Amino acid sequence: MARVTVEDCIDKVDNRFELVLLAGHRARQISQGAQVTVDRDNDKNPVVALREIAEETLSPADLKEDLIHSLQKHVEVDEPEMANEFLSHSGEAETVFATTSEEESCSFDCMSEEDLLAGIEGLVIPEKSDDY
């Protein structure tokens, strides 16, 4: 059996460092029970992974995509935007995005200074305790 070298794989994967990452990822997949695409010939998983890359039984682009996906902690999912649905129904969009009147949206900004002072004066001071 001929030994698998980096030169056998370098024409499939341009960068040697990327080749090591891809072969290591594939070797881990084989260790976890993935189907081997070449004859094992009593070789260890890293050698089998390099042989698979050299014989092009696996696509390096697919391996790279799978490696990136396995390293991601947060996977983004493309979801259709809800705004398009609202814009398509213009009558419904106006009712959904309708603004409220100023009286309903009035908050602390609309309180007068006298109302604030009356509220502060109405507060009860807690009794002093031994906690502090």
Swiss-Prot record:
Enzyme class: transferase
Family to which the UniProt record says this protein belongs: Belongs to the RNA polymerase subunit omega family.
Catalytic activity from the UniProt record: RNA(n) + a ribonucleoside 5'-triphosphate = RNA(n+1) + diphosphate
Domain of life of the native organism: Bacteria
Keyword line: DNA-directed RNA polymerase, Nucleotidyltransferase, Transcription, Transferase
GO MF annotation, one: DNA binding
Species: Bartonella quintana (strain Toulouse) (Rochalimaea quintana)
Record flagged with keyword Cell inner membrane: no
Assembly with partners or alone: The RNAP catalytic core consists of 2 alpha, 1 beta, 1 beta' and 1 omega subunit. When a sigma factor is associated with the core the holoenzyme is formed, which can initiate transcription.
Role, per record: Promotes RNA polymerase assembly. Latches the N- and C-terminal regions of the beta' subunit thereby facilitating its interaction with the beta and alpha subunits.
Name by which UniProt lists this protein: DNA-directed RNA polymerase subunit omega
EC annotation from Swiss-Prot or TrEMBL: 2.7.7.6
Pfam family, one: RNA_pol_Rpb6
Upper lineage: Bacteria, Pseudomonadati, Pseudomonadota, Alphaproteobacteria, Hyphomicrobiales
Annotated GO biological process: DNA-templated transcription
Keyword Transit peptide: no
GO cellular component, one term: DNA-directed RNA polymerase complex
